Every structure is written in structure tokens, then in C-alpha cells.
């Protein structure tokens, strides 16, 4: 899909490459994509090189952040291949409050889980500062 790498979650578009695509053609819905979605996807794919640096930065930042927090005792963080880190904490309410203090929003799930989207280096450093303070305060 184009959602993660190109920041186009709202257009709901993906593509497929392969040798046997013709066999799938009978399964396709006619006019499955709006002309707006097709135009956006076409423009983005024509400029794919411009997105490569952004993707490399996201991967690098994701790995940097994961390496720092993976050994924290108050968090369980999971390896990721996406543009976010997924974690759990039994003290999630406190963690969320600490993020709120710094005007940082993370995805909150009903159980002890949360998700942190990878941002710019500066944004990620702010997130790491909160995670460090959380770990230190609860150790």
C-alpha cells in the first residue's frame, strides 16, 4: 500500500507487481479507485525518489528509538518494520499522563498497549525524553 511509506493513508490505495497478475484481473471491481485516488497515486509514484530519503530516515529513527528502549524494564517494546513502535506497560496511564504533559499524543489501546508513530529526529527525541523519564521514575 501507499499508506505508510508515502503518508497516504487517507487515499486507500495500493499496487501489486507480479508475473501472474492477469489471472487476478477477473477478481477486480470495475472503477475500484476514484479518479482523484488514481491521480494522487500516479503523481506520488512518479516522484518516488523524493520519498526514499524520508523512508530511510523513518527506518533509521525507528531503529535508533527501539535500540534505546528495548531494555527498559517498565516497557515492553516490540521490533517493528512499520512507521511506528508498538509497546505495552502495566503503568500505561502514568505514561500517557507524562506524554500529555509534553503535548505529545500517542495511540492508546484498551489494554496495556500503545503505539508511537516515528516522527522527525527532534520529535523522536522528545518522545525518548518522556520514555527515559518514565523508566527512571518507575525503576
Report the location of each language-model feature:
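A short acidic, often aromatic-flanked loop/helix-cap motif at beta-alpha or helix-coil junctions
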Residues: 4-6, 86, 115
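Short acidic/glycine-enriched loop/turn segments that link adjacent beta-strands
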Residues: 10, 81, 110-113
Amino acid at each position: 500500500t501507499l499508506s505508510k511509506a508515502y503518508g497516504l493513508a487517507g487515499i486507500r490505495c495500493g499496487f501489486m507487481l507480479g508475473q501472474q497478475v492477469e489471472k487476478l484481473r477477473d477478481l477486480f471491481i470495475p472503477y475500484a479507485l476514484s479518479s482523484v485516488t488514481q491521480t494522487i497515486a500516479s503523481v506520488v509514484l512518479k516522484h518516488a525518489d523524493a520519498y526514499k530519503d524520508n523512508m530511510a530516515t523513518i527506518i533509521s529513527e525507528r531503529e535508533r528509538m527501539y535500540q534505546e528502549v528495548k531494555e527498559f524494564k517498565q516497557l515492553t517494546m516490540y521490533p517493528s518494520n512499520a512507521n511506528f513502535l508498538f509497546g505495552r506497560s502495566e503503568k500505561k496511564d502514568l505514561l500517557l499522563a507524562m506524554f500529555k504533559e509534553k503535548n505529545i499524543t500517542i495511540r492508546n489501546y484498551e489494554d496495556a498497549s500503545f503505539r508511537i508513530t516515528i516522527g522527525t529526529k527532534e520529535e523522536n527525541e522528545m518522545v525518548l525524553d518522556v520514555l527515559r523519564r518514565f523508566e527512571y521514575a518507575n525503576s
